[in-house]
């Protein structure tokens, strides 16, 4: 599938705090649409984005630009899974295919808090897609992202074919002492990497959660957080690993189930909320879940550990 005139959709949003509530302003161009915002228990602005075109084809570009002012809190998600259709061999003009691109840029002011939680990306056979996430945050800001990608429609017996998925992530702290890198991540999945035991080993789902905490975590606090996150893997299928960042944590999922990836990441999300002494998260109303991923014991266990919270 190839459009003669590819989309270049943009979404630019600014968030500002007023007392205990965060407000947003800005706008989008087609095919983006903003849905109705909700207020979380902590005054957070919870905002779903709709991609009205139904999917991306080669040449399409999506750009999301988010700016959070001092003390503001926001949660951004998507209304549905994003689809990227095959590009290779679909056009006589570009028989080798053209790349679809999605870029997300975030700037977080002092004491701000952003949760970037889009629904999964489904990459069809022979699709070419690049994603980038660039985050600049103040020393005392918090940023959490969880992104899941399914390579091929496995329910239809399809794999990625000749397609390719690329991802670039960079997180930088901007403070009085200059800039320091929190995380730099470059990934490419295609060809042999999909089947090699050091790649996806034949599985179709890959996910990454990153939490950049608002303050350094003590060793006992971080050890407890990682131990609890590993315990949260119980009952879920796939390979799940988590480790520390300089000021936060990173978790990876490789397996057959986007549902299990989302469940595990949701449980870690709940733990990061408790660590910040915030209200327990509310699953976004647009997520099509038939089960509750946040088990009750998640919050019971966290009550004790939250006494060691650093922020």
Curated annotation (Swiss-Prot):
- What InterPro entries does the annotation carry? UreD (IPR002669)
Per the record, the domain of life is Bacteria
Q: What is this protein called?
A: Urease accessory protein UreD
Subunit: UreD, UreF and UreG form a complex that acts as a GTP-hydrolysis-dependent molecular chaperone, activating the urease apoprotein by helping to assemble the nickel containing metallocenter of UreC. The UreE protein probably delivers the nickel.
Query: Residue span of the signal peptide, if any?
Result: none
Q: Which GO terms describe its molecular function?
A: nickel cation binding
Q: Which UniProt keywords apply?
A: Chaperone, Cytoplasm, Nickel insertion
Could you tell me what this protein does? Required for maturation of urease via the functional incorporation of the urease nickel metallocenter.
């Amino acid at each position: 599938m190839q459009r003669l005139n590819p989309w270049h959709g943009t979404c630019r949003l600014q968030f500002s705090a007023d007392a205990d509530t965060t407000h947003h302003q800005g706008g989008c161009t087609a095919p983006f649409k903003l849905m109705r915002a909700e207020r979380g228990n902590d005054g957070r602005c919870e905002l779903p984005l709709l991609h009205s075109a139904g999917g991306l084809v080669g040449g399409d570009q999506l750009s999301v630009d988010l700016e959070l002012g001092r003390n503001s809190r926001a949660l951004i998600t998507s209304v549905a899974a994003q689809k990227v259709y095959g590009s290779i061999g679909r056009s006589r003009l570009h028989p080798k295919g053209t790349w679809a691109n999605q870029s997300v840029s975030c700037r977080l002011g002092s004491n701000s808090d952003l949760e970037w939680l889009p629904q999964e990306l489904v990459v069809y056979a022979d699709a070419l897609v690049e994603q980038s996430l660039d985050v600049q945050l103040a020393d005392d800001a918090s940023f959490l992202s969880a992104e899941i990608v399914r390579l091929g429609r496995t329910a239809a017996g399809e794999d990625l074919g000749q397609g390719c998925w690329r991802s670039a992530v960079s997180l930088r702290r901007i403070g009085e002492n200059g800039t320091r890198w929190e995380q730099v991540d470059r990934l490419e999945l295609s060809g042999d990497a999909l089947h090699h035991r050091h790649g996806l080993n034949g599985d179709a789902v890959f996910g990454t959660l990153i939490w950049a905490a608002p303050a350094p975590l003590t060793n006992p606090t971080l050890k407890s957080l990682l131990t609890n996150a590993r315990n949260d893997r119980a009952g879920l299928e796939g390979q799940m690993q988590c480790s520390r960042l300089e000021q936060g944590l990173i978790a990876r999922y490789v397996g057959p189930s986007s549902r299990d990836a989302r469940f595990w990441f949701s449980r870690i999300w709940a733990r990061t909320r408790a660590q910040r002494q915030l209200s327990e998260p509310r699953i976004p109303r647009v997520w099509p879940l038939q089960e509750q991923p946040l088990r009750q014991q998640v919050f019971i266990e966290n009550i004790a550990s939250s006494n060691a919270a650093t922020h």
